[in-house]
Amino acid sequence: MGLLSGDTLGPLAVALLIFLLLLDLMHRRSRWAPRYPPGPTPLPVLGNLLQVDFEDPRPSFNQLRRRFGNVFSLQQVWTPVVVLNGLAAVREALVYRSQDTADRPPPAVYEHLGYGPRAEGVILARYGDAWREQRRFSLTTLRNFGLGKKSLEQWVTEEASCLCAAFADQAGRPFSPMDLLNKAVSNVIASLTFGCRFEYNDPRIIKLLDLTEDGLKEEFNLVRKVVEAVPVLLSIPGLAARVFPAQKAFMALIDELIAEQKMTRDPTQPPRHLTDAFLDEVKEAKGNPESSFNDENLRLVVADLFSAGMVTTSTTLAWALLLMILHPDVQRRVQQEIDEVIGQVRRPEMGDQALMPFTVAVVHEVQRFADIVPLGLPHMTSRDIEVQGFHIPKGTTLITNLSSVLKDETVWEKPFRFHPEHFLDAQGRFVKQEAFIPFSAGRRACLGEPLARMELFLFFTSLLQHFSFSVPAGQPRPSEHGVFAFLVTPAPYQLCAVPR
């Protein structure tokens, strides 16, 4: 008789079920705390996984917000989650309680990519000394290689010239701008990280872009959420390769690019770029087991810069061009301002912003309307906190619904319409808005914000300086509704770029 006969399987199944239910009850204890945020009743073990559409959670969150208010709770298998909506709740958590909400959920789901102690990159790193060390290094290195100086501005304007040349090659024919925008922005990141740019037909940049896009799609599916909540499942042989094939291939390509830089590096010379600067820090930290400067972390820091700094900016630019062809009156006003301040010969400069309030307002309104990262990146509480009168225990994952701020009907005059006047006063002067937080807020706000602002202004003004954009003749009007896949991208569209 086998060990697992019919007589023993029944009691074992009952025992396993009882164990899982007890474990489930243990993980639900936080929901019983006084003043814990309300939320839908979770199912045993699964929590609320079946009640939220993770292909696009925004509609689910909007329904739950209407039902439970600006602060509501979910259970993701056994992970407690609180969703924050509206400027007051988001600001209270990320700004006023910044130190207590600056942590990230443990990135166990990314261990297959090389994440581990002392190797967490910057974006997903736990809040602590390693994160501070890497954020400080990244900001210092960006400054040393030109952020806030003319050198980086020149890189961007030169790349903008290459982009304009590629647009001109289309000879006024209909085309999709997304691919060229991706390549231009990725070249700015490549200049910072590797000191080089790729030709737009280079197979490596094409592969890099394809894997980045596919890797982002892998972030939002039900299987991914299950292994995130129960990371032990990733120990199943071959599962990670099946769930995250693009992310693993992306990291392999990053390894190849770093290896090329190591082969050409001369340690006796000043660092050429961020990778060299990081390798110098690795040498300095040799023998220090507490340092986050190591080869494993280098690949993650570089991957962070590419994955976060490339697609977000190029997607925003794609939205900008879409909105220009849908709102030709706005396009004409931007071009008029460009002609008056810059002309049609001189390259745009960051110093021009002070004299171009309408163009700056348009760029801001593109970011607000496009709302490309509607849910931000998850935070985690490092101690018990209170937000809007609700008790949120230590170890709770926080999701900040940035879309609820960028399109808050109590803040914006026309929240669901493209309306550059949101950022202009009665005299036509640019006005900052407190509810404008596309880069998030607090200690974990996007460290690439200054670079992104530079790229958006210089690429956008360069393109509108040289071209007029329109919907191709005979094609239907493109949609203003985006497609959600972690980022919100425009639905596929084409345009015509006619030289001015």
UniProtKB/Swiss-Prot annotation:
It holds the Pfam family p450. It is a peripheral membrane protein. It comes from the Eukaryota. One of its GO terms (cellular component) is cytoplasm. Heme binds at C446. Gene3D superfamilies: Cytochrome P450. It is an enzyme of class 1 (oxidoreductase). This is Cytochrome P450 2D14. It comes from Bos taurus.
